[in-house]
Structure formats: structure tokens, C-alpha cells
UniProtKB/Swiss-Prot annotation:
Signal sequence, start to end: none
Protein name, as recorded: Peptide chain release factor 1
CC terms in the record's Gene Ontology section: cytoplasm
Listed Basic and acidic residues bias regions: 283-308
Origin species: Yersinia enterocolitica serotype O:8 / biotype 1B (strain NCTC 13174 / 8081)
């Protein structure tokens, strides 16, 4: 391993010990904000420190095995130990390189998940509903919380549009690669001839950001309309103008929220989604500029980004970004998404490593 990387790892190990000492300080414990920030830093440093300690231990094993090679009686055993230790050393070096990759500060945040029906009419709305159920199952398995912020239901089931907030550990980091176009090929329930139809929906995943980090939104740039909510809501439906539609005039971004019975709560929810959308649009512009010379696995949430095709007659799902095809569609639709998400994450990390090595 390069001496510059070893030096960086030694510095991180020292910082890990420093942070641990700070966490035992009574003054730090009394300051909850500082204590939380240091606790997060300690957790982030723990994996890389543990891996580095094991790597160092393996280097000692390699050295000991090499010394035993001079002893004829021990040579055969030493050769086996040396082979095993060198293989483990390579594994740990790869792990350390990944652990040293620049972290996206948004990865640990909650996120807003938006699913919109695209081409395909009623079938597209039904598919959007299936997608929302798939993500909800995935979230449930990871003990994340899913809260619907706004929903416009399809006439024959599913959703024309649904926006949900997903809360939990590392939510955005896991779901961010879902942004883009998703296509379904199947025979719709309404199809009497048994013909396969192609429908689509778009998914957008944005980090949920605290109020303090919200982009500055000028009240004069907003048009706020109220209207009567439709759909679920019991006796309050169509009796009060509690639903809110906010239009951000400079960008044309429109957010509707009608899930709550209180207009004030709907407005607060809509503003949080609007802030996240504006920030996501700004971040996307920056990412496009940075990634203009290399492929970008992070979709924009635009229908032109073709992420996956879900082919029901063949029980097949294909991720077009990395040419991955799995014949496990039933499991995927039940929320077992790690088999699709992890290969994308690994490919993204490989691209990052490649970019770093080019800089070196």
C-alpha cells in the first residue's frame, strides 16, 4: 500500500482516539449538539480504524511467515501462511480504499421519494403503485419509517403521483441510485386480448434537509393556491380548502400536499418538499458539470434516464446502467432490492476509485 495512504490512515486512527477521549469529557457531554456531532464522527471513523488495525496485524503475519521460510522444517507451513496472509492483505487494502472514498454528506439523511406515472395511462398508475409498495417493503425490512406526504390516486388503483418521506439510518445513500425512469412490460388486468403493454414511471429521490440548511426561498417567488382535497380523509373531504399547491415561479417547480386535514400542516409539508427539490436541482447542475467526462450512475429523476425494465412474462428485471439481468422479479417486487442496489453501489465506488487513481 502507498506510504501516502498509510500516513492518511495513521492520522485517522489518531483522530479516532482523540474523538473517543472527547466523548468522555463532561463538558462535551453537557453540550448535546457537540456530543452528537462527535458521536457521528466516531462512528464514521470506527470502520476504517478497525480495518487498518487488521491490515497492520496481517503485515506482521507476513513478516513472521517470511522469516520462517529460512527454516527447512517450517518452510512448507510458512509458504501456506504467507499465501493466505497476502491474499487477506489485498482484500483489506481494497476495503480501505473504499472506506477512504469521499463521503457524500447527504448519504446519512432521510429522503423524499417521489414516484410519478409516465406513459401508459391507467397501467402506468398501477405500476407506480406497485413501485411504491416495493419501496415500502424494502423500507420495512430495514426498519425505516415511510410517511406519505402527498398522493394523487389513479382511477383504477395505484398513483398518478405519490410523494413520501423515508426516515432511518443511511436512507438517502441506499435509495439515491433509484432516481430515473423505470419501465414495466406485462399484460394489464384491463387487457382482454392478452397483449403485453409497456408502461413507465419516474422515480426521484432527494435528501430531506433540516430547515437551517434550506435554500433561501423568497416569498415573492411563490404562488400559493388552496383547494379542496380529494381522496382519503373521511368527512373532511371537499368541505374545506385544506389542500395546498405551491409554485416556485423562477424554476416552475410545483408541489401539492393534501394529506393532512390542516392547511397549515399541508403548507409546512409542501415547503419542506419544495426546499428539497430546489436544492436537488442545484446539486444536479453541479454534478452534471463535474461528471461531464465520465458516466453518471446517479439518475436525475427524469424519464429520459432509463434505469430498469421489469418484464413480468419472463420474470426478469434488467438494470440498463450496468447491464445486470436477474430472473428474480417476484422477490424484487416484494422489496428485496439489495440484489439490485448493491451492484450499482459497487460500480459507483469503482468509478470513484478510477477517478482518484487518474488524479494520482
Amino acid at each position: 500500500m502507498k506510504s501516502s495512504i498509510v500516513a492518511k490512515l495513521e492520522a485517522l486512527q489518531e483522530r479516532h482516539e482523540e474523538v473517543l477521549a472527547h466523548l468522555g469529557d463532561a463538558n462535551v457531554i453537557a453540550d448535546q449538539d457537540r456530543f452528537r456531532a462527535l458521536s457521528r464522527e466516531y462512528a464514521q471513523l470506527t470502520d476504517v480504524t478497525r480495518c487498518f488495525k487488521e491490515w497492520r496485524s496481517v503485515q506482521d503475519d507476513i513478516e513472521a511467515a517470511e522469516m520462517m521460510l529460512d527454516d527447512p522444517e517450517m518452510r512448507e507451513m510458512a509458504q501456506d501462511e504467507l499465501k493466505e496472509a497476502k491474499a487477506r492483505s489485498e482484500e483489506l487494502e481494497q476495503q480501505l480504499q473504499v472506506l477512504l472514498l469521499p463521503k457524500d454528506p447527504d448519504d446519512e439523511r432521510d429522503c423524499f421519494l417521489e414516484i410519478r406515472a409516465g406513459t401508459g395511462g391507467d397501467e402506468a398508475a398501477i405500476f407506480a403503485g406497485d413501485m411504491f409498495r416495493m419501496y415500502s417493503r424494502y423500507a420495512e425490512a430495514r426498519r425505516w419509517k415511510v410517511e406519505i406526504m402527498s398522493a394523487s390516486e389513479g382511477e383504477h388503483g395505484g398513483y398518478k403521483e405519490v410523494i413520501a418521506k423515508v426516515s432511518g439510518d443511511g436512507v438517502f445513500g441506499q435509495l439515491k441510485f433509484e432516481s430515473g425512469g423505470h419501465r414495466v412490460q406485462r399484460v394489464p388486468e384491463t387487457e382482454s386480448q392478452g397483449r403485453i403493454h409497456t408502461s413507465a414511471c419516474t422515480v426521484a429521490v432527494m435528501p430531506a434537509i433540516p430547515e437551517a440548511e434550506m435554500p433561501e426561498i423568497n416569498a415573492g417567488d411563490l404562488r400559493i393556491d388552496t383547494f379542496r382535497s380529494s381522496g382519503a380523509g373521511g368527512q373532511h373531504v371537499n368541505t374545506t380548502d385544506s389542500a395546498i399547491r405551491i409554485t416556485h415561479i423562477p424554476t416552475g417547480i410545483v408541489v401539492e400536499c393534501q394529506d393532512e386535514r390542516s392547511q397549515h400542516k399541508n403548507k409546512a409539508k409542501a415547503m419542506s418538499v419544495l426546499g428539497a427539490r430546489i436544492r436537488a436541482a442545484e446539486m444536479q447542475k453541479r454534478q452534471q458539470a463535474e461528471a461531464s467526462e465520465r458516466r453518471n450512475l446517479l439518475g436525475s429523476g427524469d424519464r429520459s434516464d432509463r434505469n430498469r425494465t421489469y418484464n413480468f412474462p419472463q420474470g426478469r428485471v434488467t438494470d440498463h446502467r450496468i447491464n445486470l439481468t436477474l430472473y428474480r422479479l417476484d422477490e424484487v417486487m416484494e422489496g428485496k432490492l439489495d440484489m439490485l442496489i448493491q451492484p450499482i453501489v459497487q460500480e459507483y465506488q469503482a468509478d470513484q476509485l478510477s477517478a482518484l487513481s487518474e488524479q494520482d
